[in-house]
Swiss-Prot record:
PANTHER family: TRIFUNCTIONAL PURINE BIOSYNTHETIC PROTEIN ADENOSINE-3, TRIFUNCTIONAL PURINE BIOSYNTHETIC PROTEIN ADENOSINE-3-RELATED
First-level EC class: ligase
Gene Ontology CC: cytosol
Gene Ontology molecular function, alphabetical: ATP binding; phosphoribosylamine-glycine ligase activity; phosphoribosylformylglycinamidine cyclo-ligase activity
Protein name: Phosphoribosylformylglycinamidine cyclo-ligase
Localization per Swiss-Prot or TrEMBL: Cytoplasm
EC number: 6.3.3.1
Family in the record: Belongs to the AIR synthase family.
Pathway recorded for this protein: Purine metabolism; IMP biosynthesis via de novo pathway; 5-amino-1-(5-phospho-D-ribosyl)imidazole from N(2)-formyl-N(1)-(5-phospho-D-ribosyl)glycinamide: step 2/2
Keywords: ATP-binding, Cytoplasm, Ligase, Nucleotide-binding, Purine biosynthesis
UniProt-listed CDD domains: PurM
Catalytic activity: 2-formamido-N(1)-(5-O-phospho-beta-D-ribosyl)acetamidine + ATP = 5-amino-1-(5-phospho-beta-D-ribosyl)imidazole + ADP + phosphate + H(+)
Amino acid sequence: MNQPKSAPNSTDSAQGLSYRDAGVDIDAGDALVDAIKPFAKKTMRDGVLGGIGGFGALFEVPKKYKEPVLVSGTDGVGTKLRLAFQLNKHDTVGQDLVAMSVNDILVQGAEPLFFLDYFACGKLDVGTAATVVKGIAHGCELSGCALIGGETAEMPGMYPDGEYDLAGFAVGAVEKSKIIDGSTIAPGDVVLGLASSGIHSNGFSLVRKIIERAQPDLNADFDGRSLADALMAPTHIYVKPLLALMQQIAVKGMAHITGGGLVENIPRVLREGLTAELDHRGWPLPPLFSWLQKHGGVADAEMHRVFNCGIGMAVVVSAADADAAIGLLSAAGEQVWKIGVIRESAAGEAQTVVV
Protein backbone atom coordinates (compact mmCIF):
# COMPACT_ATOMS: atom_id res chain seq x y z
CA MET A 1 0.00 0.00 0.00
CA ASN A 2 1.27 3.42 -0.89
CA GLN A 3 1.91 5.68 2.10
CA PRO A 4 0.12 9.03 2.00
CA LYS A 5 2.36 11.90 1.01
CA SER A 6 2.64 14.91 3.30
CA ALA A 7 1.48 18.22 1.96
CA PRO A 8 4.16 20.55 0.64
CA ASN A 9 5.55 22.70 3.46
CA SER A 10 7.44 25.91 2.89
CA THR A 11 9.51 25.26 6.02
CA ASP A 12 10.81 21.87 4.83
CA SER A 13 13.98 23.44 3.52
CA ALA A 14 14.20 26.10 6.20
CA GLN A 15 16.56 25.83 9.14
CA GLY A 16 15.08 23.92 12.09
CA LEU A 17 14.01 25.83 15.17
CA SER A 18 15.92 25.87 18.45
CA TYR A 19 14.89 26.65 22.00
CA ARG A 20 16.76 29.95 21.64
CA ASP A 21 14.56 30.79 18.64
CA ALA A 22 11.60 30.33 20.98
CA GLY A 23 13.11 32.79 23.46
CA VAL A 24 14.82 30.47 25.96
CA ASP A 25 18.61 30.70 26.14
CA ILE A 26 19.98 27.58 27.84
CA ASP A 27 23.53 28.90 27.58
CA ALA A 28 22.53 32.07 29.45
CA GLY A 29 20.99 29.93 32.18
CA ASP A 30 24.18 27.91 32.49
CA ALA A 31 26.22 31.12 32.63
CA LEU A 32 24.03 32.39 35.47
CA VAL A 33 24.53 29.20 37.47
CA ASP A 34 28.30 29.58 37.10
CA ALA A 35 28.11 33.25 38.11
CA ILE A 36 26.12 32.66 41.29
CA LYS A 37 27.92 29.59 42.63
CA PRO A 38 30.55 31.70 44.48
CA PHE A 39 27.78 33.75 46.13
CA ALA A 40 25.95 30.64 47.31
CA LYS A 41 29.18 29.04 48.52
CA LYS A 42 29.74 31.92 50.96
CA THR A 43 26.41 31.08 52.66
CA MET A 44 27.17 27.43 53.38
CA ARG A 45 26.75 26.28 56.98
CA ASP A 46 26.63 23.11 59.05
CA GLY A 47 23.84 20.87 57.81
CA VAL A 48 24.21 21.44 54.09
CA LEU A 49 24.74 18.15 52.25
CA GLY A 50 25.95 18.51 48.68
CA GLY A 51 26.10 21.58 46.48
CA ILE A 52 23.93 23.56 44.09
CA GLY A 53 22.74 21.82 40.94
CA GLY A 54 21.05 18.69 42.21
CA PHE A 55 17.39 17.87 41.65
CA GLY A 56 16.76 18.47 45.34
CA ALA A 57 18.69 20.33 48.02
CA LEU A 58 19.70 18.31 51.09
CA PHE A 59 19.94 19.65 54.63
CA GLU A 60 20.48 17.76 57.88
CA VAL A 61 18.77 19.28 60.92
CA PRO A 62 21.54 20.27 63.38
CA LYS A 63 22.05 17.75 66.16
CA LYS A 64 21.82 20.45 68.83
CA TYR A 65 18.02 20.26 68.49
CA LYS A 66 16.43 17.61 70.73
CA GLU A 67 12.82 18.08 69.53
CA PRO A 68 13.14 20.23 66.41
CA VAL A 69 10.05 21.78 64.88
CA LEU A 70 10.50 23.05 61.34
CA VAL A 71 9.11 26.50 60.59
CA SER A 72 8.63 27.62 56.99
CA GLY A 73 7.85 30.90 55.30
CA THR A 74 7.48 32.25 51.79
CA ASP A 75 7.12 35.76 50.42
CA GLY A 76 8.07 38.10 47.61
CA VAL A 77 9.14 41.72 47.27
CA GLY A 78 5.88 43.08 45.90
CA THR A 79 5.69 46.18 43.74
CA LYS A 80 8.97 47.48 45.11
CA LEU A 81 10.28 45.66 42.06
CA ARG A 82 8.57 48.17 39.77
CA LEU A 83 10.63 50.93 41.35
CA ALA A 84 13.74 48.76 40.95
CA PHE A 85 12.99 48.47 37.22
CA GLN A 86 12.41 52.22 36.92
CA LEU A 87 15.70 53.00 38.66
CA ASN A 88 17.60 50.07 37.12
CA LYS A 89 18.67 49.22 40.67
CA HIS A 90 18.78 45.52 41.42
CA ASP A 91 21.40 45.15 44.14
CA THR A 92 19.11 45.44 47.18
CA VAL A 93 15.94 43.53 46.29
CA GLY A 94 17.65 40.20 46.98
CA GLN A 95 18.14 41.15 50.62
CA ASP A 96 14.50 42.27 50.69
CA LEU A 97 13.47 38.82 49.49
CA VAL A 98 15.38 37.00 52.20
CA ALA A 99 14.34 39.40 54.95
CA MET A 100 10.63 39.00 54.28
CA SER A 101 10.75 35.26 54.95
CA VAL A 102 13.46 34.92 57.62
CA ASN A 103 11.98 37.71 59.74
CA ASP A 104 8.61 35.96 59.51
CA ILE A 105 9.86 32.61 60.79
CA LEU A 106 12.02 34.31 63.41
CA VAL A 107 8.95 35.57 65.28
CA GLN A 108 8.12 32.00 66.31
CA GLY A 109 11.60 31.56 67.72
CA ALA A 110 13.02 29.77 64.69
CA GLU A 111 16.63 29.88 63.59
CA PRO A 112 16.67 30.14 59.76
CA LEU A 113 18.49 27.12 58.32
CA PHE A 114 18.19 27.39 54.56
CA PHE A 115 16.66 29.47 51.79
CA LEU A 116 15.55 28.88 48.20
CA ASP A 117 14.71 31.48 45.60
CA TYR A 118 12.60 31.65 42.45
CA PHE A 119 13.53 34.15 39.72
CA ALA A 120 11.10 34.46 36.81
CA CYS A 121 11.58 36.58 33.70
CA GLY A 122 10.66 36.85 30.05
CA LYS A 123 14.24 37.14 28.77
CA LEU A 124 17.14 36.30 31.05
CA ASP A 125 19.71 39.05 31.55
CA VAL A 126 22.60 37.26 33.25
CA GLY A 127 24.08 40.43 34.72
CA THR A 128 20.82 41.58 36.29
CA ALA A 129 19.94 38.13 37.61
CA ALA A 130 23.42 37.66 39.08
CA THR A 131 23.14 41.02 40.84
CA VAL A 132 19.80 39.99 42.35
CA VAL A 133 21.14 36.62 43.51
CA LYS A 134 24.23 38.27 44.99
CA GLY A 135 21.83 40.32 47.12
CA ILE A 136 19.96 37.15 48.09
CA ALA A 137 23.23 35.55 49.19
CA HIS A 138 24.09 38.65 51.22
CA GLY A 139 20.72 38.41 52.96
CA CYS A 140 21.39 34.76 53.72
CA GLU A 141 24.76 35.64 55.24
CA LEU A 142 23.11 38.29 57.44
CA SER A 143 20.60 35.72 58.69
CA GLY A 144 22.99 32.77 59.00
CA CYS A 145 21.09 30.54 56.58
CA ALA A 146 22.33 28.68 53.53
CA LEU A 147 21.26 29.56 49.99
CA ILE A 148 20.73 25.92 49.18
CA GLY A 149 18.96 26.05 45.83
CA GLY A 150 16.58 27.88 43.57
CA GLU A 151 14.90 28.11 40.21
CA THR A 152 15.43 30.47 37.29
CA ALA A 153 12.47 30.45 34.93
CA GLU A 154 12.88 32.13 31.54
CA MET A 155 9.36 32.36 30.11
CA PRO A 156 9.08 34.27 26.82
CA GLY A 157 5.95 36.36 26.55
CA MET A 158 5.19 36.24 30.28
CA TYR A 159 7.15 39.34 31.34
CA PRO A 160 8.31 42.44 29.44
CA ASP A 161 12.04 42.66 28.70
CA GLY A 162 13.96 43.98 31.69
CA GLU A 163 11.37 42.85 34.22
CA TYR A 164 11.24 39.87 36.56
CA ASP A 165 9.47 38.56 39.64
CA LEU A 166 10.89 36.99 42.78
CA ALA A 167 9.73 34.54 45.41
CA GLY A 168 11.66 33.24 48.37
CA PHE A 169 11.27 30.27 50.68
CA ALA A 170 12.88 29.95 54.13
CA VAL A 171 12.96 26.98 56.48
CA GLY A 172 14.11 27.19 60.08
CA ALA A 173 13.99 25.17 63.27
CA VAL A 174 13.01 25.77 66.88
CA GLU A 175 12.93 23.50 69.91
CA LYS A 176 9.34 22.41 70.47
CA SER A 177 9.50 23.67 74.06
CA LYS A 178 10.74 27.09 72.93
CA ILE A 179 8.16 27.98 70.27
CA ILE A 180 7.09 31.60 70.70
CA ASP A 181 3.37 31.99 70.09
CA GLY A 182 2.30 34.87 72.32
CA SER A 183 0.42 32.62 74.73
CA THR A 184 2.31 33.96 77.78
CA ILE A 185 1.72 37.64 77.00
CA ALA A 186 -0.11 39.33 79.88
CA PRO A 187 -1.28 42.79 80.95
CA GLY A 188 1.65 44.92 82.06
CA ASP A 189 4.08 43.49 79.52
CA VAL A 190 6.08 45.97 77.46
CA VAL A 191 6.17 46.32 73.68
CA LEU A 192 9.62 47.14 72.34
CA GLY A 193 10.05 48.51 68.84
CA LEU A 194 13.15 47.81 66.75
CA ALA A 195 13.94 50.41 64.11
CA SER A 196 13.27 49.66 60.47
CA SER A 197 15.80 50.58 57.80
CA GLY A 198 13.12 52.35 55.76
CA ILE A 199 9.92 51.33 54.03
CA HIS A 200 11.11 47.70 53.84
CA SER A 201 8.99 45.78 51.27
CA ASN A 202 5.38 46.74 51.94
CA GLY A 203 3.22 49.65 50.86
CA PHE A 204 4.97 50.29 47.57
CA SER A 205 1.79 50.51 45.55
CA LEU A 206 0.94 53.59 47.64
CA VAL A 207 4.56 54.80 47.48
CA ARG A 208 4.49 54.66 43.69
CA LYS A 209 1.17 56.52 43.61
CA ILE A 210 2.65 59.26 45.81
CA ILE A 211 5.69 59.49 43.52
CA GLU A 212 3.38 59.72 40.51
CA ARG A 213 1.53 62.60 42.16
CA ALA A 214 4.53 64.48 43.59
CA GLN A 215 6.91 63.96 40.63
CA PRO A 216 10.03 64.38 42.81
CA ASP A 217 13.62 64.31 41.59
CA LEU A 218 14.58 60.82 42.75
CA ASN A 219 18.28 61.72 42.48
CA ALA A 220 17.94 64.71 44.80
CA ASP A 221 19.57 64.58 48.22
CA PHE A 222 17.31 63.24 50.94
CA ASP A 223 18.59 62.99 54.49
CA GLY A 224 22.17 62.34 53.41
CA ARG A 225 21.51 60.10 50.40
CA SER A 226 19.43 60.20 47.24
CA LEU A 227 15.66 59.89 47.53
CA ALA A 228 15.94 56.81 45.30
CA ASP A 229 18.34 55.13 47.72
CA ALA A 230 16.13 56.03 50.67
CA LEU A 231 13.11 54.48 48.97
CA MET A 232 15.04 51.35 47.95
CA ALA A 233 16.86 50.77 51.26
CA PRO A 234 16.85 47.00 51.83
CA THR A 235 14.66 45.43 54.49
CA HIS A 236 16.50 45.06 57.79
CA ILE A 237 17.20 41.50 58.95
CA TYR A 238 16.71 41.02 62.70
CA VAL A 239 17.74 37.37 62.98
CA LYS A 240 21.09 37.42 64.74
CA PRO A 241 20.37 40.03 67.45
CA LEU A 242 16.99 38.52 68.29
CA LEU A 243 18.27 34.93 68.40
CA ALA A 244 20.94 36.17 70.81
CA LEU A 245 18.31 37.99 72.88
CA MET A 246 16.24 34.81 73.17
CA GLN A 247 19.21 33.09 74.79
CA GLN A 248 19.14 35.58 77.68
CA ILE A 249 15.62 37.03 77.93
CA ALA A 250 12.19 35.37 77.94
CA VAL A 251 10.73 36.81 74.75
CA LYS A 252 6.95 36.43 74.95
CA GLY A 253 5.98 37.45 71.46
CA MET A 254 7.24 39.12 68.30
CA ALA A 255 5.59 40.68 65.28
CA HIS A 256 7.28 41.38 61.96
CA ILE A 257 5.77 44.69 60.84
CA THR A 258 4.87 44.07 57.21
CA GLY A 259 1.66 44.62 55.23
CA GLY A 260 -0.95 45.98 57.60
CA GLY A 261 1.56 47.97 59.62
CA LEU A 262 1.69 48.04 63.39
CA VAL A 263 -2.07 47.92 63.92
CA GLU A 264 -2.63 44.69 62.00
CA ASN A 265 0.54 42.73 62.75
CA ILE A 266 0.85 43.04 66.52
CA PRO A 267 -2.65 41.54 67.05
CA ARG A 268 -1.44 38.37 65.32
CA VAL A 269 0.50 37.46 68.48
CA LEU A 270 -2.06 38.60 71.06
CA ARG A 271 -4.68 36.34 72.59
CA GLU A 272 -8.27 37.53 72.71
CA GLY A 273 -8.91 40.09 75.41
CA LEU A 274 -5.55 41.85 75.18
CA THR A 275 -4.68 45.15 73.53
CA ALA A 276 -1.30 46.68 72.74
CA GLU A 277 -1.51 50.40 73.45
CA LEU A 278 1.23 52.15 71.49
CA ASP A 279 2.36 55.72 72.19
CA HIS A 280 3.15 57.49 68.91
CA ARG A 281 5.58 59.72 70.85
CA GLY A 282 7.54 56.65 71.93
CA TRP A 283 9.70 56.57 68.81
CA PRO A 284 10.75 59.09 66.14
CA LEU A 285 8.93 59.02 62.81
CA PRO A 286 11.71 58.81 60.18
CA PRO A 287 11.82 61.69 57.65
CA LEU A 288 10.93 59.39 54.75
CA PHE A 289 7.56 58.55 56.26
CA SER A 290 6.89 62.23 56.97
CA TRP A 291 7.69 62.94 53.31
CA LEU A 292 5.32 60.23 52.11
CA GLN A 293 2.54 61.43 54.41
CA LYS A 294 2.96 65.06 53.36
CA HIS A 295 3.15 64.47 49.61
CA GLY A 296 0.40 61.85 49.61
CA GLY A 297 -1.91 63.57 52.05
CA VAL A 298 -2.10 60.24 53.90
CA ALA A 299 -4.08 60.19 57.15
CA ASP A 300 -2.37 59.04 60.36
CA ALA A 301 -4.59 55.96 60.63
CA GLU A 302 -3.79 54.97 57.05
CA MET A 303 -0.06 55.42 57.66
CA HIS A 304 -0.25 53.04 60.63
CA ARG A 305 -2.09 50.34 58.68
CA VAL A 306 0.06 50.51 55.53
CA PHE A 307 3.62 51.36 56.58
CA ASN A 308 5.93 50.26 59.39
CA CYS A 309 6.39 53.96 60.31
CA GLY A 310 9.93 53.32 61.53
CA ILE A 311 9.34 50.09 63.48
CA GLY A 312 10.26 46.90 61.64
CA MET A 313 9.88 44.43 64.49
CA ALA A 314 7.87 44.52 67.71
CA VAL A 315 9.03 42.44 70.67
CA VAL A 316 6.97 41.78 73.80
CA VAL A 317 8.77 41.13 77.10
CA SER A 318 7.86 41.43 80.76
CA ALA A 319 8.26 44.86 82.33
CA ALA A 320 11.03 43.44 84.52
CA ASP A 321 13.04 42.38 81.45
CA ALA A 322 12.45 45.45 79.28
CA ASP A 323 15.53 47.49 80.24
CA ALA A 324 17.84 44.48 79.99
CA ALA A 325 16.42 43.63 76.56
CA ILE A 326 16.96 47.19 75.36
CA GLY A 327 20.54 47.06 76.60
CA LEU A 328 21.30 43.78 74.84
CA LEU A 329 19.70 44.85 71.57
CA SER A 330 21.42 48.24 71.65
CA ALA A 331 24.77 46.54 72.24
CA ALA A 332 24.07 44.42 69.15
CA GLY A 333 23.65 47.57 67.06
CA GLU A 334 19.87 47.83 67.02
CA GLN A 335 17.88 51.00 67.68
CA VAL A 336 15.11 50.08 70.10
CA TRP A 337 12.45 51.93 72.08
CA LYS A 338 9.68 51.18 74.55
CA ILE A 339 6.72 51.91 72.30
CA GLY A 340 3.78 50.55 74.27
CA VAL A 341 2.25 48.33 76.91
CA ILE A 342 -0.12 45.38 76.96
CA ARG A 343 -3.41 45.80 78.79
CA GLU A 344 -6.84 44.23 78.91
CA SER A 345 -9.06 45.25 76.02
CA ALA A 346 -12.06 47.48 76.50
CA ALA A 347 -15.36 46.25 75.08
CA GLY A 348 -15.21 46.27 71.28
CA GLU A 349 -11.71 47.74 71.24
CA ALA A 350 -9.12 46.88 68.60
CA GLN A 351 -6.17 44.75 69.72
CA THR A 352 -3.66 47.44 68.80
CA VAL A 353 -4.28 51.14 69.24
CA VAL A 354 -1.94 54.08 68.64
CA VAL A 355 -2.51 57.00 71.00
